[in-house]
Amino acid sequence: MLTRLSKLSALMFLLGVSACKSPPPVQSQRPEPAAWAMEKAQDLQQMLNSIITVSEVESTG
């Protein structure tokens, strides 16, 4: 019984020591954004203004 307990204790000790010696996980860096995401955004307001124009108010009568 004592040898079984000592073997188990030795095994647990070795597992604990080996876990402490393992290197920490490497944190991966985020990849750079895609090229299209880095381009300047289009001026959609100007495009809408050229399509939609303010018309005269129609008279109801």
From Swiss-Prot:
Matching Pfam families: Rz1
Protein localization: Host cell outer membrane
Keywords in alphabetical order: Cytolysis, Host cell lysis by virus, Host cell outer membrane, Host membrane, Lipoprotein, Membrane, Signal, Viral release from host cell
Periplasmic side stretches: 29-61
GO cellular component: host cell plasma membrane; membrane
Mode of membrane association: Lipid-anchor
InterPro entries in the cross-refs: O-spanin
Secretion signal, residue range per the UniProt entry: 1-28
Subunit (UniProt): Interacts (via C-terminus) with the spanin inner membrane subunit (via C-terminus). Part of the spanin complex which spans the entire periplasmic space. The spanin complex is composed of spanin inner membrane subunit and spanin outer membrane subunit.
Annotated family: Belongs to the caudovirales o-spanin family.
Name of the protein in question: Probable spanin, outer lipoprotein subunit
Species this protein is from: Salmonella phage P22
Upper classification of the organism: Viruses, Duplodnaviria, Heunggongvirae, Uroviricota, Caudoviricetes
Name of the gene: Rz1
